[in-house]
Amino acid sequence: EISCSLVGSEMCIRDRFNADTFFNDCHPQLKADFIMANPPFNLSGWGQDKLLDDVRWQYGTPPAGNANFAWLQHMIWHLAPNGRIGMVLANGSLSSQSGGEGEIRKNIINADLVDCIVAMPSQLFYTTQIPVSLWFLAKNKKQKGKTLFIDARKLGTMVTRKLRELTDEDIKRIADTYNAFVDGTLKDEKGFCAVVTTQDIAKQDYILTPGRYVGIEEQE
């Protein structure tokens, strides 16, 4: 038995078998105010053929070879009317056009759900070198029709030859940037952050790679 506390909520995990969220949604009626998730990256063979007409695929059926947009839509399905998501996904989800992923991403963007995308630095994980980004989505965004892009790939400090960590200052910089965006006071910073309208994202074929929008850092 494993007991733990997360953000003030107690959980107890007893089952020794792995769960399957797609086929056995343990909380089918849940509408959450906040969701945090770090699902498996680029999972293939997740059972798409048995879930083709699932109600969770509001923005398009995810491809059989990659569950990234299945995870994303599962979380969106469980959001409350003012709910928010913070999620880690492999960078491929920002730009992939294969298996209908580009169309799903387009539909999610046009639904005005994407609040912020943060490109993270490499070597943050012990077990994989897959580059990742943070997706922040919201059902009732304060900044309508706009998305914040942050390129944080240069942040962090190497604590071993293979592992990088974000410092408290790095985390504060990202958080302060997001908070300024929500407040409507943020100014774009070349090479680091930019606020982009949905119309301008559409002009970029609905690709969400931050580097495409923040530009190159100005040299002194």
Predicted feature residues:
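Single conserved hydrophobic/aromatic residue that forms the stacking wall/gate
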Residues: 1-8, 13
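A conserved structural/catalytic subdomain of Rossmann-like adenosyl-cofactor enzymes
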Residues: 23-220
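Conserved SAM-binding strand-loop segment of SAM-dependent methyltransferases
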Residues: 14-19
